[in-house]
UniProtKB/Swiss-Prot annotation:
One Pfam family here: DsrE
Name of the coding gene: tusC
Intracellular or extracellular location(s): Cytoplasm
Keywords linked to the UniProt accession: Cytoplasm
Protein name: Protein TusC homolog
SUPFAM superfamilies membership: DsrEFH-like
Organism ancestry: Bacteria, Pseudomonadati, Pseudomonadota, Gammaproteobacteria, Pasteurellales
Known role: Could be part of a sulfur-relay system.
Gene Ontology cellular component terms for the protein in this record: cytoplasm
InterPro entries, per database record: DsrEFH-like (IPR027396), Sulphur_relay_DsrE/F-like (IPR003787), Sulphur_relay_TusC/DsrF (IPR017462)
NCBIfam families to which the protein is assigned, alphabetical: PRK00211.1, sulf_tusC_dsrF
Source organism of this protein record: Haemophilus influenzae (strain ATCC 51907 / DSM 11121 / KW20 / Rd)
Main location: cytoplasm
Length: 119
């Protein structure tokens, strides 16, 4: 993979995660889908929880936009197993399917990327 996008922060309160998603969508215009890898670790896994209500805290609901990754054929998506366990989440609660991997394998894959963008 040439470009890796790492999500480490929660989705609301700042625009960091939304900007990360925008960066991924922009990258799909210039890269082949298999050149892009997306990783969720720590608070970043919270970006994938379905049925969030950010309008309650006057935030924009961008979470559903993650579903566009299927449309753009971005299939290299990984989520940290330990982070899921920390928040007691399972696949049924997530808006996007990702391959569950342990932290060490996730970090190994990140090290193989040509460029790394962290959000």
């Amino acid at each position: 993979m040439k470009i890796a996008f790492l999500f480490r922060t929660s989705p609301h309160g700042t625009s960091i995660s939304r900007e990360g998603l925008d960066a991924i969508l922009a990258a799909t215009a210039f890269c082949e889908p298999n050149d892009i890898g997306i990783f969720f670790i720590d608070d970043g896994v919270l970006n994938l929880i379905d049925n969030q209500q950010p309008e309650i805290i006057q935030q924009k609901d961008f979470i559903r936009t993650f579903k566009l990754l299927d449309l753009y054929d971005v299939e290299q998506r990984f989520i940290c197993t330990a982070s899921l366990q920390k928040f007691k989440l399972d696949n049924r609660e997530l808006i996007l399917s990702c391959e569950k991997i342990d932290r060490s394998l996730l970090l190994e894959k990140l090290n193989q990327a040509g460029k790394l963008f962290t959000f």
